[in-house]
Amino acid sequence: LFLFKRGLVKQGRRTVSVVFVSDLFHKVSGGFSMLHIVVCIKQVPDSREIRIDPKNNTLIRQGVPSIVNFYDLHGLEEALRIKDEQGARVTVVTMGPPPAEKSLKECISLGADEAVLVTDRGFAGADTLATSYVVANTIKKISEHWGPVDMVFCGKQTLDGDTGQVGPGVACRLDLEQLTYVTKVVKVDEERRKVTVHRHLEDGIEVVETSMPLLITALKELNKVRRASLPGMIRAARYKPTVWTTADFPKLDKAQIGLKGSPTIVAKTWVPEIRSINGERIEGEDEAAVADQLIAKLWDSELPTRMGWTGV
């Protein structure tokens, strides 16, 4: 990383503009360093084409189109916004099968700097407990390879599991401050190592300031996800994510990963039936006539009676 400074230099009779380059050194040596932000994403089945195996109550992923989890993209967008505004290194991580590389490349096309795919048959069948264990250890390994992690972004939940447990689970395992259901990142103060956010509550908005390192779970209201640029797409096409398997985590407790480390039991799953409802258009000479027809049809349907209405 470099700092560029422009100056004027005499060359004979000419004065030319030049750029001086100096190293940007790490804060441990008394200088400055950019924030390191990790974004956790998941490749999920397209919810419009979900199928379920009735025997083991699991999602059938083979042959089903996959996308980046919707909420995770908002976490990535916020990390990229911070990168654009004040400088940051953004590393994206996912645990999943080899085809999840496609989702990581999409994140690279949007502006992420590095991507890590954690994939192994030993991780298969993981519930949220086992997943948070592996992801937390992956973030530890990322910090060893690319420097300490200041912020972690996750989506509030995934479209397939829908539990909202992995983000807080990772924060607990890493002993990070956690800010869930975030709708706005107000300020990231690198000098004070403080972050201020708005959190969505059932009865309002909570304004919270806490210290880095921290983990944030993102809501869709946080931002609008950008589109990939042409240079980003070109870089993504050439990019090869870092791939880690169980062999890269010799200290992992095998009893806490994959199916063995997943105490969750799914009793039953099903795909909701999509019922087709025939609509009816009501027309009349004026608004009053249309309203009269609508009221008459509602009474004929006995809906008001079922709801306890007895008329005026």
Residue spans for each PLM region:
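Alpha-helical protein-protein interaction elements
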Residues: 12-13, 17, 24, 63, ...
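Short, Lys/Arg-enriched N-terminal segments with co-localized hydrophobic residues
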Residues: 1-3, 15-33
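Cationic, low-complexity basic patches in intrinsically disordered or flexible, solvent-exposed regions
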Residues: 6, 11
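N-terminal glycine-rich FAD/FM-binding segment characteristic of electron-transfer flavoproteins
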Residues: 30-312
